[in-house]
Design a protein with these regions (language model features):
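Short, flexible loop segments at the rims of nucleotide/cofactor-binding pockets, characterized by
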Residues: 41-46
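Short, basic/hydrophobic alpha-helical segments
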Residues: 48-63
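Metal-dependent phosphoesterase core characteristic of DEDDh/y 3'-5' exonuclease domains
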Residues: 21-40, 61-169
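Generic alpha-helical structural signal
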Residues: 52-55, 164, 171
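Catalytic micro-motifs at enzyme active sites that drive phosphoryl/nucleotidyl and oxygen chemistry
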Residues: 13-17, 54-55, 67-69, 95
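Entry/capping segment at the start of metal-dependent catalytic domains
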Residues: 1-23
Length: 171
């Protein structure tokens, strides 16, 4: 049996390890044929269904590029590990192993772009602020998502409200 300090450390760190986590929301932004932008979110309690629906979108959409903040180092490996744990086939666009090195430019990562500056890392919040873009990251931060989700499970109505807050954060 662990100490209270060990338990707190586990609760704070485990959600960022795919082996111990659970995906409850995936949000993406897609460009329509008329160049308008739309948000698409997959959110709920069934992680395998969320991943399946997201992968179906990736497999069916003629995407030239994927993009995100720290997406190459965190999001894509995390999604792939959770896919394996859920016995799902990883979509080709996420499977780095299927691409030759010269085709990795299909994934744009703002963290990599910022690493070319004097600072080694830059938060998504700072990038959004510099570009004068709104950021929902003020609602909560990534470290809070796990506890908000798990603590809301005891009350169905509150749980749905918290899932929508997590969705807003992800978008």
């Amino acid at each position: 049996e662990g100490t209270e300090e060990e338990e707190e450390r586990y609760n704070n760190r485990a959600p960022i390890y795919a082996e111990f986590a659970k995906i409850v929301c995936i949000s993406v932004v897609a460009r329509n044929k008329d160049d308008s932008i739309k948000k698409i979110s997959f959110c709920g309690d069934d992680e395998k269904q969320i991943l399946s629906d997201f992968f179906q979108l990736l497999n069916s959409a003629p995407m030239a590029n994927l993009g995100g903040h720290n997406v190459k180092a965190f999001d894509i490996p995390f999604l792939c590990k959770r896919a394996i744990i859920n016995s799902l086939k990883i979509p080709k666009v996420l499977d780095y192993g299927t691409y030759p090195a010269w085709k990795m430019d299909l994934v744009r990562d703002t963290m990599e772009l910022r690493k070319r500056s004097a600072f080694l890392s830059t938060s998504l919040e700072l990038i959004a602020s510099c570009l004068d873009l709104p950021s929902p990251k003020s609602i909560m931060n990534g470290a809070e998502v796990s506890s908000i989700y798990w603590e809301s499970l005891n009350n169905a109505e509150w749980h749905q409200q918290k899932l929508m807050e997590i969705k807003d954060y992800c978008e």
